[in-house]
Amino acid sequence: MKTYSAKSHEVQGDWFVVDATDKVLGRLSVELAKRLRGKHKPEYTPHADTGDYIVVINADKIAVTGNKAKDKIYYHHTGYVGNLKSASFEKMKETHPERIIELAVKGMLPKNPLGRAMFKKLKVYTGSEHPHSAQQPQPLNV
């Protein structure tokens, strides 16, 4: 008996919608990364994209525990000398709340072309509306 190796074009990704209201950032991100990789499926193959599509709504209502709301800092560099920018979790939540979930999940995916393809299957929106109703996403309890 040979070991089954799934091909990316053979596995179809299902669509799921996740409500991030009052969910803890890390615990939600772990589950999203696992489903984007496809590790919850029996036909999971490390070298193929076997994951699902995930739509996250209400990203502006995400929660963190402890003092992380004040203490957690997000850094990025503009590319110019001396231009390391930083923003706290609270400021990021005010300006770009969807980026909080995106950065957390992106850090949990592989750092290669396959990981970037998996990341494209994640759609994050601040409100409760999303433009993917044609794909009929199923609600996912995390």
UniProtKB/Swiss-Prot annotation:
Return the InterPro entries for the record.
Ribosomal_uL13, Ribosomal_uL13_bac-type, Ribosomal_uL13_CS, Ribosomal_uL13_sf
Which GO molecular function terms does the record list? mRNA binding; structural constituent of ribosome
**Gene3D superfamilies given in the database record:** Ribosomal protein L13 (3.90.1180.10)
Q: Has UniProt tagged this entry with the keyword Magnesium?
A: no
One Pfam family per UniProt: Ribosomal_L13
SUPFAM superfamilies, alphabetized = Ribosomal protein L13 (SSF52161)
Determine the domain of life of the protein's source.
Bacteria
Q: Does the keyword Cell membrane apply?
A: no
Q: Name one process (GO BP) from the record.
A: translation
Give the UniProt keywords, A-Z. Answer: Ribonucleoprotein, Ribosomal protein
* GO-annotated cellular components: cytosolic large ribosomal subunit
* Family recorded in the similarity comment: Belongs to the universal ribosomal protein uL13 family.
What is the purpose of this protein?
This protein is one of the early assembly proteins of the 50S ribosomal subunit, although it is not seen to bind rRNA by itself. It is important during the early stages of 50S assembly.
What do we know about how this protein assembles, alone or with others?
Part of the 50S ribosomal subunit.
Q: Which PANTHER family match?
A: LARGE RIBOSOMAL SUBUNIT PROTEIN UL13M, RIBOSOMAL PROTEIN L13
Q: Which NCBIfam families match?
A: rplM_bact (TIGR01066)
This chain's protein is named Large ribosomal subunit protein uL13
Source organism (scientific name): Acidithiobacillus ferrooxidans (strain ATCC 23270 / DSM 14882 / CIP 104768 / NCIMB 8455)
